[in-house]
Amino acid sequence: ADGSDPAGGEFLAEGGGVR
């Protein structure tokens, strides 16, 4: 949830995170 994946579904506005 820190921005590892731009298409992640945890913090989209933060940069992604966990998918």
Curated annotation (Swiss-Prot):
Broad class of where this protein is predominantly found: secreted
Keywords from the UniProt entry: Adaptive immunity, Blood coagulation, Coiled coil, Disulfide bond, Hemostasis, Immunity, Innate immunity, Secreted
Processing and modification events after translation: Conversion of fibrinogen to fibrin is triggered by thrombin, which cleaves fibrinopeptides A and B from alpha and beta chains, and thus exposes the N-terminal polymerization sites responsible for the formation of the soft clot. The soft clot is converted into the hard clot by factor XIIIA which catalyzes the epsilon-(gamma-glutamyl)lysine cross-linking between gamma chains (stronger) and between alpha chains (weaker) of different monomers.
Any GO BP: blood coagulation
The keyword tRNA processing belongs to this UniProt entry's keyword annotation: no
Signal peptide (UniProt feature, chain positions): none
Keyword hit for Secreted: yes
Organism domain of life: Eukaryota
Annotated Gene Ontology cellular component terms: extracellular region
Localization: Secreted
Known partners and oligomeric status: Heterohexamer; disulfide linked. Contains 2 sets of 3 non-identical chains (alpha, beta and gamma). The 2 heterotrimers are in head to head conformation with the N-termini in a small central domain.
Record note on domains: A long coiled coil structure formed by 3 polypeptide chains connects the central nodule to the C-terminal domains (distal nodules). The long C-terminal ends of the alpha chains fold back, contributing a fourth strand to the coiled coil structure.
Described function: Cleaved by the protease thrombin to yield monomers which, together with fibrinogen beta (FGB) and fibrinogen gamma (FGG), polymerize to form an insoluble fibrin matrix. Fibrin has a major function in hemostasis as one of the primary components of blood clots. In addition, functions during the early stages of wound repair to stabilize the lesion and guide cell migration during re-epithelialization. Was originally thought to be essential for platelet aggregation, based on in vitro studies using anticoagulated blood.
Annotated protein name in UniProt: Fibrinogen alpha chain
Organism of origin: Alces alces alces
Gene name of the encoded protein: FGA
